[in-house]
């Protein structure tokens, strides 16, 4: 019949009422003219108008970031935060061609789509740039490092979970267990000079802007090209706060990657911190209560950046 039938509803403790929350799908136009869908959620009593925003993305491996309910989101939504998910190229939301436009030598489309979605929401006065926090993990952590380098003025904070931020170094080492299979997603920089130069132009670790030092030193660590991840020198005060999570037993993204990135960020004067889990793997802590503690810690940092923790 085409009619929806509710078969089961999870119990949510507290005074949760699903009618208190609004959702909407909007479309923004990326810099190359492509239309990007963005999913939005906010509390009915907190109209999305220059709101603090939590914007999250992934955009890799043809994985779809489908909208879904999460109890952990309620705390921020109830404080007036706009929750946004841009369905950027590199994911699988819009079919195979959508994925192909965000992989290998098209990877920068993923970063540009995310930044363009952020700017569109801010320009429409739905979100406030001074209270916007971006989030992504693993390949989405690479996305976070890239967008922080590309458009630091758009974000007050960036949370990067187990981030793949030194991708070039890792993918150049065929002795690592996942390297050769990852060439299908990112390209093979070991044997293809074009892929090497392309990855070098966007890999977060390679493109951290150097702080404007006393005396006028305004060189950049990256190539500073207009279409790359680096955009030239950025004063540390203009760069978003960075929160990194990593795990000592992560076999997918070795902990040395985010910690190298942390060291380079801090040497550039950026307000960057890391939370290191000794016993966790790529998926974070195991055990329901440990996972809730981890989420609450991350949410507390985000709300502090947004000015909502007081």
For the regions a protein language model found, what residue spans apply to each?
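Active-site-proximal cap/loop segments of hydrolase catalytic domains
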Residues: 88-310
